[in-house]
Swiss-Prot record:
Basic and acidic residues composition bias: residue spans: 196-205
UniProt family annotation: Belongs to the Di19 family.
Region described as Disordered: spans on this chain: 158-208
InterPro entries referenced in this protein's UniProt entry, alphabetically: DI19, Di19_C, Di19_Zn-bd
Protein's UniProt name: Protein DEHYDRATION-INDUCED 19
The organism's taxonomic lineage, starting at the top: Eukaryota, Viridiplantae, Streptophyta, Embryophyta, Tracheophyta
Record's signal peptide: none
PANTHER family: PROTEIN DEHYDRATION-INDUCED 19
Length: 226
């Protein structure tokens, strides 16, 4: 039952992650198209070729540096007797600023993906873990996560079992038994509460193993895709 539950959550999270990436790609492409649409074109007043404002200035400088007759400005329609290029750059310089401003806000699809990285992975894990689990009070879990650089980079906090086990009351030891030394804990039991029964400790080990396998699969899926 637990494995089916995790698999269903993983599938839902992968669908959510793919949908968000697709939305980011579309958003980036729309912004690029918008930049192309709002870029106006003007006809050269001498040869009537269409250019945007930057290529028009380059065209006037190369093809029409000295024109003997007056011509209307392609932007404001004023009669310009000479030096059309100087008139456009001085009187209509705002067009260059607007074009640079539009380019500053264009986000290609590849850059849009990089902007998603942290927020999208956090949302991915929130969906996967059902809104995120509460942090365990056991300090050994925090130590294990911080020891692994991959896990610490994602900031994972594993959910514990649905029903928290209440700690058992301390057992009072009579005075005459105070000389009895405590048995040292086994190395494999150091990260598990000693007040738990053998069956409970075994169950916690199995849960930790399932979670570790799940996190490994999740990281591989996120990094390398399907």
């Amino acid at each position: 039952m637990d494995s089916e539950h995790w698999i269903s959550r993983l599938a839902a999270a992968k669908r959510f992650y793919a949908a968000q990436l697709g939305h980011a790609d579309r958003a980036g492409m729309e912004e690029v198209d918008m930049d192309e649409e709002v870029r106006p074109e003007f006809a050269c007043p001498y040869c009537y070729e269409d250019h945007d404002v930057v290529s028009l200035c380059a065209h006037l400088e190369e093809e029409h540096p000295f024109e003997p007759h007056a011509a209307p400005c392609p932007i404001c329609s004023d009669k310009i007797a000479k030096d059309m290029l100087n008139h456009i750059t001085v009187q209509h310089g705002y067009l260059f600023k607007n074009r640079r401003r539009l380019r500053r806000f264009v986000i290609p699809g590849s850059q849009a993906l990089s902007l998603l990285s942290r927020d999208l992975r956090e949302a991915h894990l929130q969906v996967l873990l059902g809104g995120g689990g509460h942090r365990s009070n056991n300090s050994s879990n925090t130590t294990n996560i911080s020891a692994d650089p991959l896990l610490s980079s994602f900031g994972l906090s594993f959910p514990t079992s649905d029903t928290e086990e209440t700690s058992k009351p301390p057992i009072s030891i009579p005075d005459d038994a105070s000389v009895i030394k405590e048995t040292p804990a086994q190395p494999w039991d150091s990260s598990i509460d000693s007040s738990l029964t053998r069956e409970e400790r075994e169950q916690k080990r199995k849960q930790a193993s399932v979670r570790a396998t799940f996190v490994q699969d999740l990281l591989l899926t996120t990094l390398f895709g399907d």
